[in-house]
Regions:
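An N-cap/entry alpha-helix motif that binds or orients negatively charged groups
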Residues: 15, 22-103, 198, 205-222, ...
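A gly/proline- and charged-residue-enriched helix-loop-helix capping module
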Residues: 132-153, 157-170
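Alpha/beta enzyme core
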Residues: 169-295, 303-307, 311-314, 320
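N-terminal pre-core extensions flanking Radical SAM catalytic domains
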Residues: 339-358
């Protein structure tokens, strides 16, 4: 394992003891299994121990001041529950569907580029973990191995995420492969017209392999007319990723999308943006049930998942937490992340007094001042402030 650096704005004694505990318990020299992890906090620390600084900063960092990234947690930490009691919660069902496909819990695996930098299997590990757990994974167009290899790695439905890197002929050739490989839907990412200034990576003098020498001018030129053309070429259920306002959500529905993916790219693109959970209510109002809604951004707990569901999302997607699971122990580490999330979801549903997700609504939530001060790791009590490691 690598040697993590403890920053001055952390309680170094607590964090060092946690790192030491995880290193001793999950040393590469010991016979350990991912099932030995009992919290996702342990998994995150193990991930940090396994990753180089460059890859850690790529996975965990945000754009410029990282304000948008921190607001994702601030928004979630500002919502608290209003539970109901004396309900029979002896049987809790956390399952749902997305675009007609079954999900064991309302959590999908967000697209991540350069997965091969995090785990040797790259996208294969994600596909296998998703199938074993019972969820959908979004396959990034800038990860390895090929979209065909990932498609046949497991039987679960997969959604192909598209970064436009060429003209419509280029798009048509790529989407022909996507359809032949049997992908269930297409997800077009539209919040990367320019590549965000990710200063942790810049100071490392490092960019992931998938970001080098790519034709960003094509993404900078995307319009609603381009979306229509890509949608016609695809002939698949169509998801628009990167929607952040009611205005664009309404336009997306008018252009016939099947689902809207509320996202600020994990705070890695536009600095000083809103938390995705704060965007959600206005987008739900604008969509009015005409498309399904998925959200990512700061989701690391089962309670986070249920906050999004209560505000009208059909499901959420996890990015950073997915990557941390992979870094901790590959496919098995990611599967353990999902198992822990499911346990948290079921426990929280029972304590809220609900047995089905469709019983949740905004009456189960209210706003408060977050405590402790929100940051990207504030869902984990022994990581008290600022950047992790």
């Amino acid at each position: 394992m690598g040697e993590p650096q403890i920053t001055n704005d952390f309680n170094g004694e607590i964090l060092l003891s946690l790192v030491s505990l995880v290193r001793n318990r999950f040393s590469p020299n010991k016979e350990t299994m991912a099932s030995d992890f009992v919290t996702n906090q342990e998994i995150i620390i193990a991930a940090r121990c396994n990753l180089t600084d460059n890859v850690w900063h790529y996975l965990t960092g945000g754009a410029e001041s990282e304000t948008t990234m921190r607001r994702n947690r601030f928004g979630l930490d500002s919502l608290v529950f209003r539970p109901r009691v004396l309900a029979d919660v002896s049987k809790v069902d956390p399952s749902t569907t997305f675009l007609g496909h079954n999900l064991s819990i309302p959590v999908m695996l967000a697209p991540i580029g350069s997965l091969q930098s995090i785990t040797p299997e790259g996208g294969l590990a994600v596909a296998k973990a998703a199938a074993e757990f019972g969820t959908i994974n979004f396959v990034s167009s800038v990860t390895q191995p090929s979209l065909e290899d990932i498609a046949v790695a497991s039987p679960n439905p997969k959604i192909f995420q598209l970064y436009v890197q060429g003209d419509l002929n280029w798009v048509e050739n790529l989407l022909r492969r996507v359809k032949q490989a049997g992908y269930a839907a297409l997800c077009l990412t539209v919040d990367t017209a320019h590549y965000g200034r990710r200063e942790r990576q810049m100071m490392d003098r490092w960019l992931p392999p998938s970001r080098r020498g790519v034709g960003y001018e094509y993404r900078a030129g995307l319009t609603w007319e381009t979306l229509d053309a890509i949608k016609r070429i695809a002939g698949l259920p169509f998801i628009l990723k990167g929607v952040a306002t009611a205005e664009d959500a309404a336009l997306a529905v008018e252009h016939g999308v099947s689902a809207i993916y509320v996202s600020n790219h994990g705070g890695r693109q536009l600095d000083h943006g809103r938390a995705t959970i704060d965007m959600l209510p206005e987008i739900v109002d604008a969509v009015r049930g005409r498309a399904e809604i998925v959200l990512d951004g700061g989701i690391v707990r089962g309670s986070d998942v249920l906050k999004a569901i209560a505000l009208g999302a059909r499901a959420v997607a996890i990015g950073k937490l997915q990557g941390w699971g992979l870094a901790a122990d590959g496919q098995a580490g990611l599967l353990r992340v999902l198992e822990i999330l499911k346990d948290e979801v079921v426990t929280t549903m029972g304590l809220l007094g609900v047995t089905r997700l469709d019983q949740l609504n905004s009456n189960y939530l209210c706003k408060v001042e977050p405590i402790p001060p929100a940051h990207e790791m504030s869902a984990f009590p022994h990581m008290p402030g600022g950047r992790l490691l």
